[in-house]
Amino acid sequence: MKSFYLETFGCQMNVVDSEQIVGLVQSLGYSSVDSPEQANLIILNTCSIRARAERKVYGHLGRFKPLKQRRPELIIAVCGCVAQQEGQRMLEKVPYLDIVCGTHNIHRLADMVRDAELHRARHVEVDFLEADKRRRLFPERAPSAEVSRFVTVIQGCDNFCSYCIVPHVRGREVSRPSAEVLEEVRLLVEQGAREITLIGQNVNSYGCKEDDEISFASLLRKVAEVDGLERIRFMTSHPKDLSDELIDCFADLDKLCKHIHLPVQAGGDAVLKAMRRGYTRDQYLGRIERLRRVCPEIRMTSDVIVGFPGETESEFEQTMDLLERARFTEIYSFIFSARPGTSAADLPDDIPKEVKQQWFDRMLALQEEITRQYHQMDIGQVLPVLVEGSSRQGNGQLFGRTTWNRIVNFDGNPDLVGRIVPVRLTVAYRNSHLGERV
């Protein structure tokens, strides 16, 4: 039997794309294996959000070269954002690569693989599709009994933040028809899903460009009506598009988890303007204030970039002050990495490397203390936990997540998977809590 090995890098959008890829190659008679050495077909689904992620892809491809030399019939494919960005250059850089499949072309992957099998043909397909075709083009995903699943509601991004490659590799915003979203949610619940995360580069702008479509807040309310669904999450949200209507959903919908990821990126107006974020510091803090007023128990995470071109010590201190005010439970922090094709790549990199690292370390230390305070505060609380499966610690425990998206490991029987159970948090670790079932 033919076999394939798939490795996924990057965001939740790529996770969904990979599930579609699995469905497509299984339709050709391929079965999944755990290592590239066993595979007849190797697929990398890639991320190019930062230079490091791109380098990682080429590093992996280098390790596959000896496999291709030993087995010339082996098919190697690269999908996703690096494929979209590099296109034909990938085939030139990696002469043993067979397929380069862009973000709009996953539906064509089965045909490309079949052609590579029969004719040893090499393929590059990275053309963007028209919006109407993209809107209805979602290949069937491989079935899964996982408790928590992602559902794509919008693709692409229209914001063109100056540092971000996403609009260049994912294209402009296109909302998926709400009827299709609801149909997929129902199907996944029938397969065993109890939690659905609605995803997109900017879910808040769902439906804004389609005259016949509902708002994202209205979509949330319809998803909440699906029988058998216990929890809803969504990501990612752009602060400038976070409406009062959407914020009110946190108070109105019991199924909506009390957590939001709201990337701020910087704390000073000058840097935010240079980033083309479309909001000010005060406007961002105003959204946070309203979220907490409407839903006092909500917790927030965020993204922050340090060392953006032109950033001053004073502007960095404004970011530190914003972290103190916002009190995120966690941040995903990065030192600025210029991406080719973005407008920020043309700006002078005028901040010394050691200064960037110093700022980054200070910011990380501050946030780690805030995070530690949250985790210690939670010890002793009894919280509803959706049980997702066996703990990744490999110690026979189960794991699940709180409404705040915090991982909890605890002792319990496997028949609890898929249920929401009360768990008392007993010990706090950096990335999880230990608990005991009540």
Curated annotation (Swiss-Prot):
What GO annotations for molecular function exist for this entry? 4 iron, 4 sulfur cluster binding; metal ion binding; N6-isopentenyladenosine methylthiotransferase activity
Q: Which reaction does it catalyse?
A: N(6)-dimethylallyladenosine(37) in tRNA + (sulfur carrier)-SH + AH2 + 2 S-adenosyl-L-methionine = 2-methylsulfanyl-N(6)-dimethylallyladenosine(37) in tRNA + (sulfur carrier)-H + 5'-deoxyadenosine + L-methionine + A + S-adenosyl-L-homocysteine + 2 H(+)
Q: State the InterPro entries in the record.
A: Elp3/MiaA/NifB-like_rSAM, Methylthiotransferase, Methylthiotransferase_CS, Methylthiotransferase_N, Methylthiotransferase_N_sf, MiaB_methiolase, rSAM, rSAM_horseshoe
The GO cellular component terms are:
cytosol
Cite the MTTase N-terminal domain residue spans from the record. 2-118
How the cofactor binds, per note? Answer: Binds 2 [4Fe-4S] clusters. One cluster is coordinated with 3 cysteines and an exchangeable S-adenosyl-L-methionine.
The record's section on Gene3D superfamilies has: Methylthiotransferase, N-terminal domain, tm_1862 like domain
Enzyme Commission no: 2.8.4.3
Q: Which cysteines are joined by disulfide bonds?
A: none
Chain sites annotated for binding [4Fe-4S] cluster 1: 11, 47, 81
Q: Where in the cell is it found?
A: Cytoplasm
Q: Where is the TRAM domain?
A: 376-438
Q: Which Pfam families match?
A: Radical_SAM (PF04055), TRAM (PF01938), UPF0004 (PF00919)
Recorded family membership: Belongs to the methylthiotransferase family. MiaB subfamily.
Report the HAMAP family cross-referenced here: tRNA_metthiotr_MiaB (MF_01864)
State whether it acts alone or in a complex, and with which partners, per the record: Monomer.
Q: What does this protein do?
A: Catalyzes the methylthiolation of N6-(dimethylallyl)adenosine (i(6)A), leading to the formation of 2-methylthio-N6-(dimethylallyl)adenosine (ms(2)i(6)A) at position 37 in tRNAs that read codons beginning with uridine.
- Please state what the protein is called: tRNA-2-methylthio-N(6)-dimethylallyladenosine synthase
Recorded name of the encoding gene: miaB
